[in-house]
Amino acid sequence: MNNFILFIVTLFCWSPTWYVIKFQLGYVDPLVSVFYRFLIAAIIIFVYLIYKKKNLMFSLNQHLWFLLFGTCLYSLNYVFFYLSNTYLISAFPAVVFSTVVIMNILGEHFYFKKKPSLKTLIGATIGMIGIIIIFSDEIFNFSLANGTHVGLFLALLGTFSASTGNMVYQRNLNNNFPLIPTLAYAMLYGSLVTLLITQIKGTELLFEYSLSYIASLAYLSIVGSIFAFIFYLRLLEKVGAGRAGYVGVVMPVLALLISTVFENLEWQQDLIIGLPILIIGAVLVINQKIKPIK
């Protein structure tokens, strides 16, 4: 599968998840839904690996890296984003997540000594200006009585966790960790970390038997977790974390279109101006490092 197809498939697997997550909120605590999502995904992958008689034996050191990867990408990342969705319309956490491309570039510099160029810094600055414009009302009308600032902060924490997970996967890739078994163990460990968090909080393990909850959980577990991450991490293997992060740049556009259709989102002037600026900044960051996807 070539890079462009990997990019498109990943994009269309992930973009609807920002809206679908809304059906997970309500009766069941968001953290419990995260636990269910990745436990189900892990079980499905393990069944596949056992059926295919793939090797599932790894060293303690490898398991520790699986644990770190899973904690960052399949626990904390989603815990923060599920919680942010209780404060923000679904498209806005997706917009914040687009900054993952900037965090990935900086992470590559910090962890792998890849020094960012001047163009990288300019692109990152432009991207941040776009974010500020989009959320200008929330920024300039900051109030502790308004939950928006909490949602933004949680979305940024989720993005940072995702970027850190990308860096851990890049490290694991450099050490020849196999993709599918890595996903299986990382999702299992991530789900268990989330379960631990729920128990520390004293959260009750409830389940909602409505069609909307079960259908959204199935989509998020199978399409939004298994397939999306297989395609995304395969793309990361082929083109690097910086360019793979371009998925996070385009995703807000589709997420906003979905919110426009299903949540009656009105495109205000700050959104119309800020979103293209955000995309321009992120594209500048990517294009200066690696040639565009072909």
Predicted regions and their residues:
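Specific transmembrane alpha-helical segments of multi-pass solute transporters/efflux pumps
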Residues: 13, 17-18, 46-97, 133, ...
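Juxtamembrane helix-loop boundary signature in multi-pass membrane transporters
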Residues: 1-8, 99-160, 275-294
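Membrane-interface helix termini and inter-helical loops of multi-pass transporters
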Residues: 19-30, 86, 135-148, 198-212, ...
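C-terminal-most transmembrane helix of multi-pass membrane proteins
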Residues: 37-39, 137, 213-215, 249-294
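C-terminal transmembrane-helix exit sites in multi-pass transporters
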Residues: 44-53, 100-125, 253-273
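Helix-helix packing/entry segments at the starts of transmembrane helices
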Residues: 34-36, 92-99, 168-191, 221-261
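Glycine-/small-residue-enriched transmembrane alpha-helix faces in small-molecule transporters
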Residues: 1-32, 144-171, 192
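Transmembrane alpha-helices of multi-pass small-molecule transport proteins
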Residues: 27-76, 103-104, 160-168, 183-202, ...
